[in-house]
Structures are given as structure tokens and as C-alpha cells.
Amino acid sequence: MTQIQQAGADSQALRTPADYQAQLDEKRERLTQLFAGFNPPALEVHASPAEHYRMRAEFRIWHEGDDLFHCMYAQATKEIIRVDHFPTASLLINQLMPVLLAGLRPHFVLRRKLFQIDYLSTQSGQIIVSLLYHRKLEAEWQQAAETLQADLQAQGFDLRLIGRAHKQKICLGDDFVIEQLNVAGRQLTYKQVENSFTQPNAAINEQMLGWALDVTRGSEGDLLELYCGNGNFSIALAQNFRKVLATEIAKPSVDSAQFNIAANGVDNLIILRMSAEEFTMAMRGEREFNRLKGVDLKSYQCNTIFVDPPRAGLDDATVKLVQEYDNILYISCNPETLQANMAVLGETHEVARFALFDQFPWTHHMEAGVYLKRKAG
């Protein structure tokens, strides 16, 4: 094993604010060049905190006798690197890491065949820890885990512990946390469920939501969002529109979105559990769905659509669907696929706003946002 104490901390100790700005400037130049052919306006650049910006982290666990450590695999060499501190992750995760290991070490039943620990933290102070095992978890494990959770809570951690094994999930309390985001002077509440997608960089998420609010301010008509997840964007944007329709297919995400709608007092947003293809058929009157009983689609005038697709971007059919709307708000975690989609969308729409969000500092990855308006004539 490659014993690199505080691997993350040592590598970041040499980084300066100038180093952060240099990597951000390189991304600015790269994104500007990538979209030069679409004649966008000046790029709006949103910087991230240089450390403690990632709200979730996953670590493999390395065992040496009765001891155990967090570790990661070096991408280039596949070496196992011991991680005692991880400045990329939130301060809360870093505070909990050594305390959690200290609580695990004395208990063989908690250590045995433990191979991974996942953390999901929040700015609100709540955190979920998932312990992953290569064995079935018995009553003895649950009893020891409940004691560990109580000990950690007594030390001041607002923690929920979860045990996972093959076809097994044991929750010692809730399997979600409640996050608080400050967006354009307003506090928004979001339920985030363990093992479901959430935006990894809370500070950048707040900036993305604020930017999306700004670019859609003064919008007329209604908003449609495809695959809304837990309602992260729809809930923030609802104040700018008469009504909002959002689609999502994953039931846990739909349930979280419904919770978040109520928690934030939003009264003009409806979540539909259906795919983009099904929604398109329903809007065009090609098929009826029982799930739409009580929803009058004809009362909606959705002239703005919001999409935040996975790294693969939008498929051809969805690009054509999106192209039917006058205003398109597109957040992309892969500017290369956004550029490919823009080759089609750019035939009918022009870029009105253009943004870079440094969601993943110190990596080559970029998050981009474009607000497109239909060309005149």
C-alpha cells in the first residue's frame, strides 16, 4: 500500500489563489473557443470555493489488522492512496472522517468486510454516512451501529447512519438530509435522498440557480422542465413563471420533489411522473395517460423549456422537442455534447446568455449554461 498521509491536503497545500484563478482562466478560454462559432455574448464566469466545495464523497476502505483507513485509487497508476484528510470535500465530511474511523476500529462486527464509506453532507449541518459491506448484515451489526450512531450524535454530529449490503439496506433513522440553499436572497429547502443524484457543489448550485433566475426574469407564460430530479431548478424558477410543469421518471426523486414543493410553499408547480417522450405524446393529444387525470395540459402555455441532461447530452429526438420552444435554458455538465446539440439548436435559436460554472475545480471538467431565444423571423 502507498502510505501517503493526508494525500489530498499535501497536494492542495501548495495551491494558491493565483493557481485557482489560472485554472479558471484556462477553462474560460477553452469554453469561449468551443462556442465561438455561435457568436455568444460575453461569458459570465462563476468561481467555486477553492476547497471544501464538494458535498459528497466516496472512499474505499483499507484494512490492516485491526486498523482501517479511507483510501482512493490513483487514476494513472492505480495505486492505493491513504486519505486522512480530503480538502475537496466539505469541512463537515473532513471533521467526521477521523471520528467515524475511531468509532469503527474497536468493533469487529462493524469493520468486518466493510469496503466503502459514502458521505452526503449539507450546508445545513446534516450528514448521511453509508457503510457498504461484502456480507449480510445481522442484528448484531445493527445493535453496534445504533450505538456508534448515538456516540457520534452525542459528539455533535447531526448524522444518519445507513448499512448497505447485497439486496440489503438498513436505515438507522432517515435516509435523507434537508439542505438549505441561499438563492438571490431567498432560502430554499431541499430534501436530498441517499444514493440519489444531488448537485455536488452547493456553492456553485446556488450560483446556477441564481443565474437561471436572472436570465428568466420577466418571462411570459409557463415553464417546462424535463427530468427535474428533486425539483432543484423548478422550485427556484417557479417565481418567474405563471405555472411550471416538470417531468421525472424516478419515484424517489418525484417523492423528494413533492416534499420540496410543500417545504418551499410553491403553489404553481406540478411534477408529472413520465418520460419526455410520454409527455410529448400527451401534449400533442396522441395518447391519454391516467397519471394526467386532473391536469389540464391545454391550460399551459409553455414557451420556455429547461433541460439539464447527463454527460451524453440530449438525444436527437429530445433536441427536436426542445427546439419547438421559444426560449431554451440549457445547463450542461459536458460542453462538448452541448456544442453538438447547439449545432442543431443554433439553426433556430441564438445565444442570449452564456455562463461557465466551476462545478469541478482543479479538474478539466466544466459546467456551462446557455439561454437561447428563438431567432426573429
Curated annotation (Swiss-Prot):
It is an enzyme of class 2 (transferase). InterPro entries: MeTrfase_TrmA_AS, MeTrfase_TrmA_CS, SAM-dependent_MTases_sf, TrmA_MeTrfase, U5_MeTrfase_fam. PANTHER family: TRNA/TMRNA (URACIL-C(5))-METHYLTRANSFERASE, TRNA_TMRNA (URACIL-C(5))-METHYLTRANSFERASE. Belongs to the class I-like SAM-binding methyltransferase superfamily. RNA M5U methyltransferase family. TrmA subfamily. PROSITE patterns: SAM_MT_RNA_M5U, TRMA_1, TRMA_2. S-adenosyl-L-methionine binds at Q199, Y227, N232, E248, D308. NCBIfam families: trmA_only. The active site is at C333, E367. It catalyses: uridine(54) in tRNA + S-adenosyl-L-methionine = 5-methyluridine(54) in tRNA + S-adenosyl-L-homocysteine + H(+); uridine(341) in tmRNA + S-adenosyl-L-methionine = 5-methyluridine(341) in tmRNA + S-adenosyl-L-homocysteine + H(+). Dual-specificity methyltransferase that catalyzes the formation of 5-methyluridine at position 54 (m5U54) in all tRNAs, and that of position 341 (m5U341) in tmRNA (transfer-mRNA). One of its GO terms (biological process) is tRNA methylation. GO terms for cellular component: cytosol. Its EC number is 2.1.1.-, 2.1.1.35. Keywords: Methyltransferase, S-adenosyl-L-methionine, Transferase, tRNA processing. This is tRNA/tmRNA (uracil-C(5))-methyltransferase. It comes from the Bacteria. One of its GO terms (molecular function) is tRNA binding. Pfam families: tRNA_U5-meth_tr.
